[in-house]
């Protein structure tokens, strides 16, 4: 159940004394708050915080009723919110997401939707994850936990080596399993791929001293 509806089934002979439910979720509390003098905005903030919470169980997820897989693109959006909103217990799930991403890679390929059997490589999302703005860097900036950088350095280097450069020094695009950069149209894939690749390279280089 995800808060949308509750269906009870019982025979006619059953006498109902009380009906109810118990909410369950990841072991963390929402402690951050943002308030405005506009109740509509306050409601939006409350709903947004709850959305993050219900998307946290044994892993981060896109949404609990349609897509429970831990897609890295979703985690990259959720991770910064964790440090604004949740207590320190949520950092354990954040670290687990990084561990899953790094340790469940397929050879030199960093894939999304892990753990799980329906993993896929979306190069843009994997580059984002190991970039200066990705969820690994975000976690480190907020915790100072160098262990995740030790996990990440060699796999990140090997992943970046999967790309080749053209005569102009720009990366030659890789399709992976899904060449996805954004929804809708007029997405400048070449610019985005080079930008994410460069940022991932800078971030990886900055972590080399921890080898």
Spans of features found by a protein language model:
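Substrate-binding groove/exosite segments of carbohydrate-active enzymes
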Residues: 1-8, 12-164, 179
């Amino acid at each position: 159940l995800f808060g949308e509806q509750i269906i009870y089934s019982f025979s006619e002979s059953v006498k109902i004394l009380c009906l109810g439910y118990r909410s369950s979720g990841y072991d963390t509390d929402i402690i951050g708050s943002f308030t405005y003098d506009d109740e509509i905005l306050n409601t939006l903030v409350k709903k947004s915080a709850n959305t993050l919470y219900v998307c946290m169980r044994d892993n981060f997820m896109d949404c609990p009723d349609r897509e429970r897989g831990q897609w890295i693109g979703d985690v990259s959006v959720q991770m910064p919110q964790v440090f604004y909103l949740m207590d320190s217990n949520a950092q354990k799930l954040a670290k687990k997401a990084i561990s899953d991403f790094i340790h469940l890679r397929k050879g030199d390929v960093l894939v999304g939707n892990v753990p799980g059997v329906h993993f896929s490589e979306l190069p843009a999302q994997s580059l984002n994850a190991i970039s200066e703005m990705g969820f690994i860097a975000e976690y480190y900036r907020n915790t100072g936990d160098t262990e995740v950088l030790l996990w990440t350095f060699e796999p990140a280097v090997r992943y970046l080596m999967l790309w080749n450069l053209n005569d102009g020094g720009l990366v030659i695009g890789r399709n992976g399993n899904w060449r996805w950069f954004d929804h809708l149209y007029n997405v400048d894939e070449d610019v985005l791929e080079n930008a994410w690749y460069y940022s991932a390279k800078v971030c990886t280089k900055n972590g080399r001293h921890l080898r």
